[in-house]
């Protein structure tokens, strides 16, 4: 028996999805030269500070994924936890954290990925998903795609199928979305920004 409940989506708004996406885009703060010179950091925290805008943001993902019926949502450390856990709650499904190496207390599997200068690793608990689970992988932003690709590989190593990768922001100039799509991962993003 499926114990999912209908989403608690706002019904009092009359805005279109494009209006919603414009609101989301306008609310994201751009911080120049952070964390290093030349970088235009896309800060999603203003989206979370307004209950109205946060609801609009979550509703975008609820509308997308309610009928697709994933078995679980896996969120990438750390901002993917914010969106992913709320979305999992709205869809009445489980949430799986994919953490930076050394942050999970139980038995884990690890996947490394390349950074601009060096490498990093993420981990997942070995019992986080079951073979055959259909999982949505979510983060706040797609830049180079390295973290999301590592998350995809972790979930697949545990036997899950990643049905889609999702993010609020795509930075297409960094090539991550193209790389992920070329690796067979469908993507859903709400807004894109030129420059990085």
Swiss-Prot record:
Keywords per UniProt: Cytoplasm, Glycosyltransferase, Purine salvage, Transferase
Pfam families: Pribosyltran
Gene Ontology molecular function: adenine binding; adenine phosphoribosyltransferase activity; AMP binding
GO cellular component terms, A-Z: cytoplasm
Purpose of the protein: Catalyzes a salvage reaction resulting in the formation of AMP, that is energically less costly than de novo synthesis.
Oligomer and partners: Homodimer.
UniProt cross-references to NCBIfam families, sorted A to Z: apt, PRK02304.1-3, PRK02304.1-5
Name listed for the protein in its UniProt record: Adenine phosphoribosyltransferase
Species this protein is from: Methylibium petroleiphilum (strain ATCC BAA-1232 / LMG 22953 / PM1)
Gene: apt
């Amino acid at each position: 028996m499926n114990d999912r409940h209908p989403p608690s989506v706002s019904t009092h708004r009359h805005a279109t999805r494009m209006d919603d996406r414009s609101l989301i885009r306008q609310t994201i703060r751009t911080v120049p030269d952070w964390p290093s010179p030349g970088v235009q950091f896309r800060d999603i925290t203003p989206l979370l500070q307004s209950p109205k805008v946060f609801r609009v943001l979550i509703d975008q993902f609820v509308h997308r994924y309610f009928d697709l019926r994933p078995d679980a949502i896996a969120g990438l450390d750390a901002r993917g936890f914010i969106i992913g856990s709320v979305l999992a709650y709205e869809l009445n499904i489980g949430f799986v954290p994919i953490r930076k190496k050394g942050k999970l207390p139980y038995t884990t599997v690890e996947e490394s990925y390349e950074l601009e200068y060096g490498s990093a690793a993420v981990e997942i608990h070995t019992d986080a998903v079951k073979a055959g689970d259909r999982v949505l992988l979510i983060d706040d932003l797609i830049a180079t795609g390295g973290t999301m690709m590592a998350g995809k590989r972790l979930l697949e190593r545990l036997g899950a199928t990643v049905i889609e990768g999702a993010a609020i922001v795509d930075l297409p100039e960094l090539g991550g979305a193209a790389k992920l799509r070329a690796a067979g991962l469908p993507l859903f993003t709400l807004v894109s920004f030129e420059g990085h």
